[in-house]
Structure formats: structure tokens, C-alpha cells
């Protein structure tokens, strides 16, 4: 069954030429023109990569510091103990502690966007695997969310550090700013993100690595970029 689209969506969708692959600047400029929502929409990137996540060496995940942040306020839970609790809170964590939060999560509490933990807490957090894992919230050293320097990690993520991972279909979705950002800032964020994606290309990845690259607003139509152009300009 087709998804019902509102009148405003259908109007802005006409701005996007079907089948066309846009260059970076052109696509981002067009995306800003597709705003229809009353709230400040997020500019999102959707990638389809030439990887097979069933192979461990092709499970792409990592972090990138977007030069201008995502524009989103990230609610952070720091799972740690002792003096690190105060350090995490001072760095901007919304919640910090250990057993009390682990117990709350087991009871269904999920009022946070990101979990950062010190390594000593991981055996305890292990029992939250089914809850956090399915939502992509499980702390992991590769995504910079398991670290002894929890204060620095909290500070970086609050400033705009972005964690990403490929899903089982070989896709990655990530926010790169808000629609009301200056176009140059969105472009710089996009390039920083793509630079990291390209650097993480597995040696075992066969054929075309960047299969599709598209950008859109939260409620808007997708605008496809030319993967060949993205691959040349960035990296």
C-alpha cells in the first residue's frame, strides 16, 4: 500500500527531478527548499554501501565530529562510578551513575539518546544487551562510547560528535544538521561525515562502495547525489 503524502509534500516533491543524480551543493540547496513541517527539520543522509554486514570486517561503525554539530540536543546517560560520576555531570551528562540506572533500564526506562560507559561497568551493562542492543544504544569502544575518560567523551558528543553504524541491509542513516543551518555549514558537515565513511571502507568490500547517497529533511523527499562525485570530492 502506498504511503499517503500530504499536499505540501507533493508540492515540494515536484522540485526533485526523478532519476537525476545531483552534485553535493546542488542537492543540499534543493533539500533546504523542501521544508514543509512547522518544526525545524533535520537534514539527514541515507547511504547504501557495497558491504555485507554478515562479515565481521564489513560491519562499519565509527564516530565523526561534525564541525557545526547536528543541531540536536543529545540526552546522555553516563554509566560509571566514584568520582567519574561528578566528572561526567560536569561535562554535560544528563544522568550519571551505575546500578540505579541499570535497574531503571531493566524496568523499561529509556529517556536518553546515548549511553557512554567506563570499561569497568561493561560486565554490569552486559545484562542490558537485549534492551540496548536492539535500539542501537549499547556502548561500544569502536563508537567511542566505552572509554576511561568519560568526561571527554561526554563533552565531545555534546558538541556534535556523531556515532554511526551500518545496519543489516548495508545502510547508514545519520543527521548532519538542521534545515535552518547556513548552507556552507551543512555542506561542511556532510563532507566531514562522508570523509569518515570513505576512510572506513573495508579492504574486502567488492565493487562499488558508495551505492546510493541521498539527503532529505525529516518530513521531505529524498534527493539523490551522484556517488561518483561524492567519492571524488570527499576523501
Curated annotation (Swiss-Prot):
Oligomeric form and interacting partners: Part of the 50S ribosomal subunit.
GO biological process: regulation of translation; translation
InterPro entries found in the cross-reference section: Ribosom_uL1_bac-type, Ribosomal_uL1, Ribosomal_uL1-like, Ribosomal_uL1/biogenesis, Ribosomal_uL1_3-a/b-sand, Ribosomal_uL1_CS
GO cellular component terms given for this protein: large ribosomal subunit
Family statement drawn from the similarity comment of this UniProt entry: Belongs to the universal ribosomal protein uL1 family.
Record's protein name: Large ribosomal subunit protein uL1
NCBIfam families according to UniProt: rplA_bact (TIGR01169)
Record keywords: Repressor, Ribonucleoprotein, Ribosomal protein, RNA-binding, rRNA-binding, Translation regulation, tRNA-binding
GO molecular function: rRNA binding; structural constituent of ribosome; tRNA binding
Cited HAMAP family: Ribosomal_uL1_B (MF_01318_B)
Function of the molecule: Binds directly to 23S rRNA. The L1 stalk is quite mobile in the ribosome, and is involved in E site tRNA release.
